Amino acid sequence: MRTEKEIRGFLKQNGFGEEAAEEAVAMLKEYRYLDDERYCKEYFRYAKAKGRADGRIVKELAAKGVSPELARNAIEDARCEAEVDRGMAGASDFFGQPQTDDRALAMEIGEKMVRQQRENGKDRDEKFFARVGRRLAGLGYDSGTIYSVLGKLRQDERDRQRDY
């Protein structure tokens, strides 16, 4: 799948004029071969499976020529569809937060890194937690989410060491 901008760029790069490119895009849209909203939903599912944050997904879609508003709306629709597919429409945790929020996903990634580090018998020192933070930042999580996750992971680690 491609976005309208990507198709226009490809056609212009290969010698088609502005008018021909617009006609081709209009025809592709008419036959439903080209749909930026559907593209956003599919890209959201792909990017979430990779652990990316919503903000990063919106930026990546904007780079592909999708308006940020369309991207956010499509992401919200895709999230609702995913909840319905899982039979969790309206599901929320104790605090009323959606179960698919960025903090929960970031926490899963951090916990996985801690678990792998523990299984490999390696120390979980400040250097390690800095690496977790960089990983989360690379996935596009905001600093508040990262600090919150790191604080919880550090506290869990202190509690674990105190128990042993």
PLM region spans:
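An alpha-helical, amphipathic repeat domain used for nucleic-acid recognition
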Residues: 1-164
